[in-house]
Structure formats: structure tokens, C-alpha cells
Amino acid sequence: MRILLTNDDGIHAEGLAALERIARTLSDDVWIVAPETDQSGLAHSLSLSEPLRLRKISDKHFALRGTPTDCVIMGIRQVMDIKPDLVLSGVNSGSNVADDVTYSGTIAGAIEGTMQGVRSFALSQAYLYEDGARIVPWEVCETHAPALLEKLMVLDLPEGTFLNLNFPNCRPGEVDGAEVTMQGKLAFNLQVDARSDGRGFPYYWLKFGERAGAFIEGTDIHALKHNKISVTPLKLDLTDYSVTDRVARALGYGAQV
């Protein structure tokens, strides 16, 4: 089995090294095409205004000056001579749950793999933020991901569907199994931090305030809170079929779809 790895934290990220170790428990044909620098929060964006610079680090290991989406496209269409059987994106430093999925470059790696017709999974590891530092328990995903992936790889997923896996912030032995979940809802409470440079010109940072949400049973955020691995099926089709008829009636048309 041939596996392509990517991420959004960059080629030197600890989570990518963890993902490679995970992938090598499944196959000895593992390829990496990952961003040269941190691409967090760039979602499913393409580089259309700048050239893509590809750097070979070692056999089957490449860094690309581009987004996670660029990396998957280049991996499948340029770097690899044979299409991969599986795309794994991650392991992200921090969970990708609830509304995170709309911003996440990690999720985008799995989205692009799916669009390229390859079975794809996104993996993220929740962490503790303490005294201004991230404490990421990588051993959780490394312990539990291999067996989980072996089970999920044989699934007959519908076309356009991929899986979003999130591992809880706890010790490996404290993980209370895996749960199939739905996407939850979190308020980001994004804030704008206004500053001035040395010449008095303004510049800004976006930052997260305290995040709040309803930890409803069955959601990804509820699963993580209860030390469960969250497995959420996501799909490329963003159509809200529940309101198509109402929109059609508002426009004076008959029932649609």
C-alpha cells in the first residue's frame, strides 16, 4: 500500500514525524510532501499567484513552498509516479473539531486527497495549553491511530467522503475508545490585537479568546471532553438539502432536488 502524508504545520513539525511513524506501521511505501513553512488556518487554498518551489529532502521526502492543498496536488500529480492508495493529513498540533474544520489546512489536505479520488483521513491531537506553552501528548495518537486506521481503511466510503480523526488530551491508557461523531459547534471569540511598529504604523494579529460551545452528546467536542477518539465522517458536498424546497418556493419555482 502506498501512502502520501501531508500537514499544515510544516515539514519540520513534530506531528508530521508522529504521522510518519504511524504510517510505517501500515506500509513501508510512505511518501511525504509537506509545506516548507507553517500553513495553519489556510484551509483549502491554492497558490495561484506564486510559483510552487519543491525541495527534495531525502528519498520520498519533499518540502513544498505552498499550502497543504498544493502539497497533495503536487504529491499525486508530480512527485509520485503511481497514485497513492491513502492520503493522511496531520497529525495536527491541536484538535480540528466543530467550526475548526472550515479553517483547517489539515482538513484541507484530506479534502484535496478526496477530490483526487484517494481515500483520505485527517488526524489531529488535542493538547493542554499551560503557562504559555503547548503540552501535546503525541503518544496518544501514536498508540491508538495504527489499529484505528487498519479498521477504517477497509471501509467502503461514499465518493466525496473522508474521515476526521481527533485524539483526546489525556494519557494513552486513559482513552475511552473511539466514537463516531457529528461536527459540533464552538464560538471562536476571535479578537483583533492592534499594535504599532517601530515607525508608528499599525499592524494587527488575530487571536482566539475563550472558546465556548454546547458539548452535546454525539458531537466531536463532547467525545474529546470525555477522553474518546472522535471519528467524524465529512463530505465535500456542502449543499443544504433541507432548505432547497424553501428557497425554490421563495423564488417561485416548484420543489427542487
From Swiss-Prot:
Cofactor field: a divalent metal cation
- Location(s), subcellular: Cytoplasm
| SUPFAM superfamilies per the UniProt record, alphabetical | SurE-like
Task: Provide any one GO MF term from the record.
Answer: metal ion binding
Residues binding a divalent metal cation, per UniProt: 8-9, 40, 92
A Pfam family assignment: SurE
Main location as per UniProt:
cytoplasm
Task: Keywords in alphabetical order, please.
Answer: Cytoplasm, Hydrolase, Metal-binding, Nucleotide-binding
Cofactor: how and how many bound: Binds 1 divalent metal cation per subunit.
Presence of keyword Ribonucleoprotein? no
Q: Which family does it belong to?
A: Belongs to the SurE nucleotidase family.
Protein name from the UniProt record:
5'-nucleotidase SurE
Q: Which organism is it from?
A: Rhizobium leguminosarum bv. trifolii (strain WSM2304)
